[in-house]
Amino acid sequence: MPNFSNPEDRESLLPPPMNRRRFLQCSAVVGGGVIVSPLLRRAGDAPAGVPDSLLPWYRLPLCILQTVLRETDARNYDAAAVVSYMKKTGYNTLIVNAGGIVDFFQNPLPAANLDPFMNDRDILREITTACRAAGLRVMARVDFRGVEERVFRQHPDWFSMDAAGKPLQLDYTRPRLYASCYTGYYRNEHAEEFVRYLLAHYPLDGIWHNSIGWDGICHCPRCRESFLQATGAPVPEPESASPAALDGYMAWKTSAADKHMARMQATVKAFGDDKAYAAEVFSMYNPGGRINSGIDLYNARDHFDFMVGVAFPIESTEPTRFAELSYAGTVVRFMKSMAPEKEAVILYGENGTLHRYIMDPPVDLRIYLWEALAAGGRFWNANFAGAYPDATSDRRNAFNNIEACRFVRQHATLLAQHAPVATVGIYYSRPTRLFYRSPSAEGDRFDAAMKGFENVLVEGHIPYDFIPNDQLSPERLRRYRVVVLANVRCLAQPEIDQLSRFVWNGGNLLATFATSLNDGDGTARADFGLADLFGCSFTGKIADTRQDCYQYILQPKHPLVAPDSGATELLFNADRTLLCRPAPDAEVICTHVPEVHNQPPEKAWAESWSREFPTVIEHGYGKGRVLYFANQPDQINCDIGHPDARNLLSRGTRLLAGSLPVETSAPESVHIGLTRSLASPGQYILSLVNTTSGPVRPVRRCLPVFDLEVKLHLAVRELVSHQVLRAQGKCRIEAHGSDVRMRLSRLDDFCAVHFQMRS
């Protein structure tokens, strides 16, 4: 028996666990038999939130407008009109061009490149003065990724070089800018002087560092010298270098990026802690290439005063596709999991990013904003084609976000410093993400497993967040009833030890496919690192189960399959399946059925269904339980959406979690958010987001839903008061002790209720 210490008490937010019999008896739909107290009083005054004076402005709810000015916008720039639009729509912060590539102020510094349409005006002076008079915050947008040829010729030694000493240029810009690197003079000494000048001469509240990342390999003298000192080797060439050499370069580059961000942050903070510094970080799902920017939220969170995740509804992919409607909430949950005390902001654009002169689908965008709010997030509208959204070629979305912005402005005190409540933690592994920089031979993808599992949790109204691998600790794990390892290939031994201790002491684990088959640096293991927990061992063989393969229900009375087993012997399977041998004490629920060839159909039969290799196993480990899926139900749910895959994951999560903080009669198309105040214990906000619509994207129209019921089980003493922040129909709140029931007669788009609980 492992010598693990006993766990401390679980977080009080978690309700009592549920045994197997109770799991089978309970329904996900709120039914009768609820003891209800008389209608509680509404809060006369909003419960006390965090006083503004105790937090810097960038830790309070943000509604950001970014106007990415074109050179020609300077011709008729009207600062008063920009301010009027912001006041009308509810934005409280403006991010506007200062310069770098093109300067929108009278720049006296070296490498200046003044907007030719500005003449003797100073656009930055005009807009900062107007915003300050109106009580609006302003951050200056700076961009040091590269310069035009005229500026490059003045200072060629400031910029990036290839192995032959020739300047590097950016392929995606027109004109092709001459690129800069993390160690070069342009991004460092020049950028620092530039930022110091702005903060010393303009009434700014901070700096927005645009396009901070750089994806290439630089051979400038500074990079060569720094890399040689760090590694004792020359800068590698991608065409001839080994994967290990390129990984070594990326380790150095990540460190260089980290130092660069720290240097820029220090430059800004030299003017006071009230000056904000931030930049955007791209997809949490994209593994990137072997050579990438070296910047993600793992290092950015330490340097940025608020967290920004790029979340456009239409993804920049080939072919173009829509992101999930819940993606804005996903990004917020991830950022809040990284740094819950910081504002988590989604960066989107009412006129999109792929076709910047035309609106993005308006209903999808409104849903996006409500999804972000429901998870405790805020939003940032990046306007790329005009002085402000109502002064562009396409103005159809100019006031699309007005209700969401006004909601934040009206309830800013209550919304401040909120983070999601979570019963389930999805383990986010940076090493696993990096593993997928090279496509997997088995076809599994980093994003698909997590997206597929998230869809199950969102549709099932199961509160969740993420566990970043570098924040794994006994204290963090104690927050959760269930930890999900959605094909987390790469786990180091210390991670395995902590997860094992978590389960041994009473925690529960749900894992899929190749979880723990690689160590922390991606090296393959012969067997699962978590084999003792899974209750099985990997044979080293992988079955191609993409077509005509199934799962045989071996234990028809098990809660995972009991709702189906009366009508079927088989369940769906697809993608790949790892062939494993179960341990003697493991309970095999389903087994792998090899391909039953469908042609000719007269020969498409099997004498019996194979029982040799398990696909679904339940295994006890100490005081805890583990469900292991040797196949890929999460990726299947993402790509195909077959109900068998979804149901197995949903039932498995509920079985392990027991009673959940949220029960509801709402359909899957109504997404539920539950957040709690980090600064004022006992304060919660329950949100409902309606995504009910037709079967295609973009969403044409959100269809109202009626007669919804939500029950909260927060394991606190009682409800003191509530305040309906937004609702379309009648909203009735009832309670008995710590249980709260909300009945809503109609939901059009978004409903939110604030609760003050007594512990």
Language-model features, listed with the residues they occupy:
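N-terminal secretory signal peptides
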Residues: 1-18
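Active-site neighborhood of glycoside hydrolase catalytic domains
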Residues: 186-292, 299-300
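Active-site-adjacent "subsite" loops/lids of carbohydrate-active enzymes
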Residues: 145-202, 237-250
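Aromatic-lined carbohydrate-binding/catalytic grooves of carbohydrate-active enzymes
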Residues: 89-121, 147-156, 216-226, 292-295, ...
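Aromatic- and glycine-enriched glycan-recognition loops and surfaces
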Residues: 71-89, 112-132, 259, 448, ...
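Glycine-rich, aromatic-flanked loop segments that form ligand/cofactor-binding clefts
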Residues: 64, 92-96, 126-170, 208
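N-terminal twin-arginine translocation
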Residues: 15-25, 33-50
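Carbohydrate-binding surfaces of carbohydrate-active enzymes
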Residues: 242, 246-247, 251-283, 300-758
